[in-house]
């Protein structure tokens, strides 16, 4: 849609629908996760700008074309790398070994009409269920991944640095503050949890309510916002911590920033 007039500019059917992550790049390309049909998945479409319209990659040219994003949230690094969390369907690693994979693609190497090769793909613990899991980036090429039972740190080269098992069930996308600490929601325990970046050790946990089925948001002044349930009512929680802002030059949270614009680089 045109942001001034609201007039529809373009529409296109995606393979098996679309839900979860959608991000825009400053060169006009758009990354859109697809759905799944009859056990078949199509990964992440790349839309290429063509004048006042776009053309999309074929299913075979998509990122992670044979694994399933499953409603996850995409992250983009300042270097143009795209990170996608998938439910493992066995295209590259046996489903007996892992239920979740993280793919890294270099958008700068992606060209229209060509099949893109991932920079790397890495197995992570836990499962990427249909609950909006995803990734945050620290600005140095490292990413933090949420699955149902683990928060995992991955290096810029795809190596797992640490994997922290959550006490209950994680939910949403981790957020990173300007001191590098990582936050996630434990939906089952109703807690906001803070992790130390070097080791993944939990150094703080704040009981807020119940059913924290959301992703934490860190504002420009460092306030952490979380939505959940309290005494049976939908509630917005505001938490003041030690941080004074969100991670600079980083995909610091769901949507990349407090505005959730999905558009930074």
PLM feature segments, named:
Residues 1-265:
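Extracytoplasmic/lumenal domain signature
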């Amino acid at each position: 849609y045109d942001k001034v007039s609201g007039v529809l500019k373009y529409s296109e059917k995606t393979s098996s629908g679309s839900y979860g992550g959608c991000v825009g790049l400053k060169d006009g390309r758009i990354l859109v996760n697809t759905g799944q049909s009859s056990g078949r998945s199509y990964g992440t479409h790349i839309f290429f700008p063509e004048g006042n319209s776009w053309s999309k990659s074929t299913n075979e040219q998509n990122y992670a074309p044979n694994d399933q994003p499953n409603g996850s949230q995409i992250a983009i690094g300042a270097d143009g790398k795209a990170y996608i969390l998938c439910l493992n369907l066995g295209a590259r690693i046996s489903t007996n070994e892992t239920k979740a994979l993280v793919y890294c693609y270099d958008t700068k190497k992606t060209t229209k009409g060509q099949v893109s090769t991932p920079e790397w793909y890495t197995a992570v613990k836990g499962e990427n269920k249909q609950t909006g899991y995803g990734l945050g980036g620290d600005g140095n090429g490292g990413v933090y991944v949420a699955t149902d039972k683990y928060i995992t740190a991955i290096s810029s080269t795809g190596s797992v640095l640490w994997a922290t098992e959550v006490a209950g069930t994680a939910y949403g996308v981790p957020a990173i503050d300007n001191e590098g600490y990582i936050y996630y929601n434990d939906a089952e325990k109703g807690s906001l949890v803070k992790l130390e970046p070097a080791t993944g050790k939990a150094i703080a946990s704040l009981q807020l309510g119940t059913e924290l089925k959301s992703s934490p948001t860190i504002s420009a002044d460092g306030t952490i916002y979380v939505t959940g349930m309290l005494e049976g009512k939908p509630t917005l929680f505001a938490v003041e911590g030690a941080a004074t802002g969100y991670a600079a030059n980083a995909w610091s949270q769901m949507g990349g920033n407090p505005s959730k614009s999905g558009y930074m680089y």
